[in-house]
Amino acid sequence: MSKEAIEMIRKMDMEQVENQFVLQCAPLIAGLKMSNLFIIRKNHLRRLCALLQNSGIRCRVLYLDGDKLTVLLYNPAMLAIYMRNKRVTTILMENGYEQFDLESILLEFGRRYRSYRTENKSFPHELGLLLGYPIDDVEGFITVSYTHLTLPTT
């Protein structure tokens, strides 16, 4: 990246949701990724929704923490196709999901994510599937619990 481009980015007002969106979600906007996790101030949600109108990208609020929202931005067509992958469905089934249409998956994931944030429940590693991470990586994170890892002693 050129020095000019870097300087231009540094001068951008990162409090503006439009700038955050373009910089953090460029692969999603370009159709190269199916989803993106995005954290914004609560008072920016309306501007984000207006920005997404007619874009083909949807927004789902996962969690409110003070004045910050954690949202999942996603291309519904791309994500629905991916979530129908047999290995993805198997992982979800093994982790207690009962319905496998995109809306049901997103509702259940949202519930689990909120439980993780508010009730100290285990982290819902299926987030990796929703973000398009390699299936083998997601399976590995689900299978290997951090409680089984030990640090070397010196």
Q: Which residue ranges define each predicted feature?
A:
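Helix-hairpin-helix/helix-loop-helix acidic hairpins
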Residues: 101-120
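A glycine-rich, hydrophobic loop/mini-helix early in the fold
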Residues: 47-101
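Short, surface-exposed beta-edge/turn micro-motifs
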Residues: 33-35, 67-69, 124-126
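Short beta-strand-to-loop capping motifs
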Residues: 39-42, 73-75
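Short, extreme N-terminal leader segments that mark the start of a protein/domain
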Residues: 1-40
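Conserved small/polar residues in nucleotide/adenosyl-binding loops
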Residues: 147-153
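Short, flexible, solvent-exposed loop/turn segments with mixed acidic/basic and small polar residues
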Residues: 22-31, 59-64, 114-118
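Hydrophobic/aromatic-rich, well-ordered segments within soluble, folded domains that form packed cores
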Residues: 123-146
